């Protein structure tokens, strides 16, 4: 590994996203994998992270030593679980290392903890690191400003059958964009529908969640008017799209002042 490359510590390296990040880093010209952290009870402890990810051996074995991983890194990427967030933030603050948080399902208290931590370190937090999805966010905002007040709006979230949180973090972000842009509140949001329904409230925003098959991630925002329908859709074809965005975010953070950044800042949107 070249010392001129950014050293990236990966937390949660044995999962789907971790494997994708390891694969993309293996061919990166700017960054390299310095360590990959898994839980102390993981069956993957000591295994070569490259071989586990389906590429050639990279000499970076899975470890449970979070402190050492963070200490030796230029930036940390965390795709573990929301239960690990406090440990990640504590280690990053202690060693003054910036961190990309890709973990979804964070509680409101944890989101508040990110704001507090960002006073001391740089943090990129986004429910979706894909460049395309962040364009979806921007296009949704534009459409909401242009026609949202005169539209029935629905969000569709489709993911693989193994995904644990619902709605997805991306769907929640789309909801937040719509609520903020249109001046509405969570009282205007409805999750699915069943039974005998009253006439649709014109300010209502519906969210519909599918968990089936092996779908990586599809999201659509619908704007229905009496005359036309706009559908803004993003479909992930490969998890590498999230990995590329995450690594780009890590490279963005290195040397940057403390603060809480999103992917709009990373992409200059």
Curated annotation (Swiss-Prot):
InterPro entries: DapB_C, DapB_N, DapB_N_CS, DHDPR_bac, NAD(P)-bd_dom_sf. It comes from the Bacteria. Its main location: cytoplasm. The keyword NADP applies. It catalyses: (S)-2,3,4,5-tetrahydrodipicolinate + NAD(+) + H2O = (2S,4S)-4-hydroxy-2,3,4,5-tetrahydrodipicolinate + NADH + H(+); (S)-2,3,4,5-tetrahydrodipicolinate + NADP(+) + H2O = (2S,4S)-4-hydroxy-2,3,4,5-tetrahydrodipicolinate + NADPH + H(+). Pathway: Amino-acid biosynthesis; L-lysine biosynthesis via DAP pathway; (S)-tetrahydrodipicolinate from L-aspartate: step 4/4. One of its GO terms (cellular component) is cytosol. Keywords: Amino-acid biosynthesis, Cytoplasm, Diaminopimelate biosynthesis, Lysine biosynthesis, NAD, NADP, Oxidoreductase. GO terms for molecular function: 4-hydroxy-tetrahydrodipicolinate reductase; NAD binding; NADP binding; oxidoreductase activity, acting on CH or CH2 groups, NAD or NADP as acceptor. The active site is at 159 (proton donor/acceptor), 163 (proton donor). NAD(+) binds at residues 12-17, 102-104, 126-129. It is found in: Cytoplasm. GO terms for biological process: diaminopimelate biosynthetic process; lysine biosynthetic process via diaminopimelate. It holds the Pfam family DapB_C. (S)-2,3,4,5-tetrahydrodipicolinate binds at residues 160, 169-170. The keyword tRNA-binding does not apply. Its EC number is 1.17.1.8. Belongs to the DapB family. Catalyzes the conversion of 4-hydroxy-tetrahydrodipicolinate (HTPA) to tetrahydrodipicolinate. HAMAP family: DapB (MF_00102). PANTHER family: 4-HYDROXY-TETRAHYDRODIPICOLINATE REDUCTASE 1, CHLOROPLASTIC-RELATED, DIHYDRODIPICOLINATE REDUCTASE. This is 4-hydroxy-tetrahydrodipicolinate reductase. It comes from Leptospira borgpetersenii serovar Hardjo-bovis (strain JB197).
